[in-house]
């Protein structure tokens, strides 16, 4: 049993800035950061809102590929949440897709204080090979990759078992275990465990008294 309930308080979080290119980041990467990437409509915005307990923090769009900027949110205790552009949506041109993938690659190569890369994937979809490659790249760069299977509440028990089996197979394929969370932003399932994981990984769990629910 976790020492915190699912309502474990998370640091107060506010929108900080957006950048279109990595050369605009200046000293944004001088503080600890966690980043969220995933295909369009993977549930990134909903997750950020649930994680921060701030419904309007990240705007949820029904239009695939709406997020094309790197959006940075900063917590009261000084670490960044970085929302990376969605990718892989069908309406994007080949050039747009390539540009976004280059942006993601450049981010992994240049963001100095990146501690965790969260890779989101809708539980109703198969886990793409491209994401496995991203996990391997992150590991090579000493960045902790963490997979989040979102919208887990949309599946019945059989479907959830299939997703877990799929992730076990993915770990076997690359030969290295990685952390996986099964999350529902709408019901709150897994949110408390995710908050706890973030605070412990960043070494700020002792500052719980300074955060707000």
From Swiss-Prot:
It comes from the Bacteria. The keyword GTP-binding applies. Keywords: Cell cycle, Cell division, GTP-binding, Magnesium, Metal-binding, Nucleotide-binding, Septation. GO terms for biological process: division septum assembly. GTP binds at residues 38-45, 65-69, 83-86, 150-153, 183-185. One of its GO terms (cellular component) is cytosol. GO terms for molecular function: GTP binding; metal ion binding. Residues 30-204 form the EngB-type G domain. Its cofactor is Mg(2+). Mg(2+) binds at residues 45, 67. It holds the Pfam family MMR_HSR1. InterPro entries: G_ENGB_dom, GTP-bd, GTP-bd_ribosome_bio_YsxC, P-loop_NTPase. SUPFAM superfamilies: P-loop containing nucleoside triphosphate hydrolases (SSF52540). Belongs to the TRAFAC class TrmE-Era-EngA-EngB-Septin-like GTPase superfamily. EngB GTPase family. Necessary for normal cell division and for the maintenance of normal septation. This is Probable GTP-binding protein EngB. It comes from Leptospira biflexa serovar Patoc (strain Patoc 1 / ATCC 23582 / Paris). The gene is engB.
